[in-house]
Amino acid sequence: MNMFFRLTALAGLLAIAGQTFAVEDITRADQIPVLKEETQHATVSERVTSRFTRSHYRQFDLDQAFSAKIFDRYLNLLDYSHNVLLASDVEQFAKKKTELGDELRSGKLDVFYDLYNLAQKRRFERYQYALSVLEKPMDFTGNDTYNLDRSKAPWPKNEAELNALWDSKVKFDELSLKLAGKTDKEIRETLTRRYKFAIRRLAQTNSEDVFSLAMTAFAREIDPHTNYLSPRNTEQFNTEMSLSLEGIGAVLQMDDDYTVINSMVAGGPAAKSKAISVGDKIVGVGQTGKPMVDVIGWRLDDVVALIKGPKGSKVRLEILPAGKGTKTRTVTLTRERIRLEDRAVKMSVKTVGKEKVGVLDIPGFYVG
């Protein structure tokens, strides 16, 4: 069960989301959802665990020692830089690390969900603190250092240590923008927008995110090339393998709260319309006979799911053209089957001295 996937949102499309329509800021911890396991996850956990333990080429025992390794990997996936959780948080859950094998077999993933929810709460607190640091005068006169890779560093012992880490992080972010030629006002505006967006993303997480992370930690502990694919990622994987999909032929990306056209597939509906340009923002999506849905602040994968559809069907996009002071317009596109030619193997012949050399360019592996 050796799997892989690349996260590129292909909306028949292909995908990447920010301007400034009204999107509610998250200012309280109780606005962050407390995520719980959904019914189907118990069944999937039992089946995945059974498949891994019985059929994986690498034989292993899902015992207490292996359970502890899964816990450590999950913990580091949650807080890779060790700058969100406290040492006491880690110690609290470490007492249950040997129980994860039993949870995976039974499908009752309480430790995974409880730890994820705590990390969400702590992350909210950190970005709120970072916003408060931005209100202070910038000072680059000290001889400070900032450790970019804290993956091997111990977790902070208390809030004071955690605050010190984030003081350094904010200063590093400020200095990076300063060196890029930004004014103090522009720096504060940019970082305020960045940190608030990170907080809003916390409110967009769902139960599948937790489950996928738990299964990924389990799979990668067995073998670094083994992965769990959620239903959405399975669809993405199949698209990558077939080099085709049905949609509008646009590569999208997230920019703050907005879904932005990053590029377009030549000959696809978006490019042929000549009504959409790179840099335009998609602020609304409407299906035939249904009202336009405001997608500002949505997760990218949710916007992609709304835009994709069967060949021959129509989708309406409310487009905010790139640039300041522009008004939105509605563009109707007919979805088509898109061939991802740029990802196919290409052959060329190059002359080297008196010899000719054949060169194969293989962007990725696929079927067909």
List PLM regions with ranges.
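Acidic/histidine-rich, surface-exposed loop or edge segments in extracytoplasmic proteins
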Residues: E24-V34, S45-Y57, K95-E99, R193-F197, ...
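PDZ/PDZ-like domain segments forming the peptide/carboxylate-binding groove
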Residues: N76-L77, T98, F112, N117-Q128, ...
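Cleft-lining beta-strand/loop regions that shape enzyme active-site pockets
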Residues: A22, K36-E37, T53-L62, R200-S207, ...
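Cleavable N-terminal signal peptides
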Residues: A9-A11, T20-F21
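N-terminal-proximal low-complexity accessory segments that begin disordered
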Residues: E37-D79, D89
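Boundary at the C-terminal end of the N-terminal hydrophobic targeting segment
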Residues: T20-A22, A29, E189, T205
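Bacterial N-terminal signal peptides that target proteins for export
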Residues: M1-T8
